């Protein structure tokens, strides 16, 4: 389990400080450490978990990712400006992630008329796709559906729902392929206050391995 050794070290640190306080005060009491006291014993929080945005925004979608220490929320941003069809990709993105961006653009272009988007948008506008926390490398294909949604949102002006997270690889035909790390991703969504997560149909079978408290019974029907 990722982080268990670090957790053991932090617990040991709390125990040492409690023992020292008892020894210094010569008291003979039982000490109960609660969450409010953790900052006193361990200092200011070193990490923070991502939280869902409060407002729906155009061109911004909540994705999900898996890191070496568990799942995380992944913010996907898309901005369109007048230009000549240049696509800028930033956020320390790996090769597979960049290929996913290109696939998402092609999917949107192939369905532009159906979606109410100018079919020649790729000739008249520049796209900038960014994933914040640029110091953290990002890779993998599972952001495909989020990228498509962010692109459609920015090109139509329709805000994407901030309280909805999504994950899934997308093909050029618009099919959504299964992903890995579903448990970690759902845990990240749960921590972030997100109650609705869109997952590939083929990952439905993986829900049997997910703690029931993370999803309603409707999700497995």
Give residue spans per PLM region.
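A short helix-loop-helix "switch/interaction" segment in the helical subdomain of ASCE P-loop NTPases
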Residues: 1-4
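C-terminal helical "lid" of AAA+/P-loop NTPase domains
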Residues: 6-20
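Peripheral, non-AAA+ core regions of ATP-driven protein-machinery
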Residues: 30, 48-53, 57-62, 69-217
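Amphipathic alpha-helical
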Residues: 31-46
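C-terminal accessory/connector segments of nucleic-acid motor ATPases
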Residues: 35-39, 63, 76
